[in-house]
């Protein structure tokens, strides 16, 4: 009996060793080994994307102009936060000098201005184009030399269906700026396609974010304002940040090596 138990124990140990040798390695994430720089990462789509990127194995630099919104991300392994005003060209250059050239740049920062052309002042125009277009131009300009040197990279620009894709009521300067983003995206994609750099745009419809809540709550009738936003969505609901983040993961991954200069519409059927 003693000999049997001893042999049985040895047999169990051998089986355990064999099993350890045949266990499959954990699957690598779709962004494993990549670094990503995300603007406006403190909330909404930017935050959801930062978390999705880390889940897929990326090392993330999450930036935002508001330090308070970055605090919870500081606790997430794989994410390093920095306060960044993307309209400050010197600050943009400084962060690239600090972190080096990322494999992925997600230009998510932007501002939704309301009103029609008669309600748009020069100051409104300048603010929207400075944040929605000029800042994006400087972000791309800062990372492109390093991406060229590395032999590739992925740039993702946040646009909107309220652009050259569809006319949306009371979105004059916002739509003009987001149309500019589409033109800029295609131009940069064409210029750098031969150097392994992919440049694509995401064009969402209305997405449930803190900034949307702020706009709704600032309206005379918040309940009706929310109903109006939902009413223009054929699916009967708003998008959520995680859905946009999933698309950003796809565009940042090697799965899209053959996609550049595209406009990825994710709008719940709004442009049908």
Feature names for model-found ranges:
Residues 145, 190-191, 257:
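Alpha-helical segment proximal to the catalytic Tyr-Lys
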Residues 137, 237-266, 271:
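C-terminal substrate-recognition "lid" of short-chain dehydrogenase/reductases
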Residues 116-117, 121-129, 229:
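Substrate-binding pocket helix/loop in short-chain dehydrogenase/reductase
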Residues 140, 177, 185:
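Active-site helix of classical SDR
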Residues 160:
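Residue(s) in the substrate-gating loop at a strand-loop-helix junction
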Residues 193, 198, 259-261:
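Short, small/polar-rich loop/turn modules that mediate ligand/substrate recognition or access, typified
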Residues 2-27, 249, 260-272:
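Short C-terminal tail/terminal secondary-structure segment
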């Amino acid at each position: 009996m003693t000999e049997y138990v001893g042999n049985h124990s040895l047999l169990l140990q051998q089986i355990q060793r064999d099993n350890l040798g045949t266990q499959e390695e954990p699957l690598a994430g779709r962004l494993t080994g990549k670094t990503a720089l995300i603007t406006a990462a403190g909330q909404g789509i930017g935050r959801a994307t930062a978390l999705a990127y880390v889940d897929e194995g990326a090392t993330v630099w999450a930036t935002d102009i508001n330090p308070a919104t970055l605090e919870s991300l500081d606790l997430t392994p794989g994410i390093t936060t920095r306060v960044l005003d993307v309209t400050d060209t010197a600050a943009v250059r400084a962060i690239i000098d600090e972190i080096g050239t990322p494999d992925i740049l997600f230009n998510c920062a932007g501002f939704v201005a309301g009103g029609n052309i008669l309600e748009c002042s020069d100051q409104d125009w300048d603010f929207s184009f400075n944040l929605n277009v000029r800042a994006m131009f400087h972000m791309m300009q800062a990372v492109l030399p390093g991406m060229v040197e590395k032999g590739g990279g992925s740039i993702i620009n946040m646009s909107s269906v309220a652009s050259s894709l569809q006319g949306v009521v009371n979105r004059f300067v916002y739509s003009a700026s987001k149309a500019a983003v589409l033109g800029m995206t295609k131009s940069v994609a064409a210029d750098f396609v031969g150097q392994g750099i992919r440049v694509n745009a995401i064009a969402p419809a209305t997405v449930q974010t803190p900034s949307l809540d702020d706009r709704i709550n600032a309206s005379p009738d918040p309940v009706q304002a929310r109903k109006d936003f939902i009413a223009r969505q054929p699916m009967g609901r708003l998008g959520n940040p995680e859905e946009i983040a999933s698309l950003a993961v796809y565009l940042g991954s090697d799965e899209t090596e053959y996609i550049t200069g595209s406009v990825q519409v994710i709008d719940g059927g709004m442009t049908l």
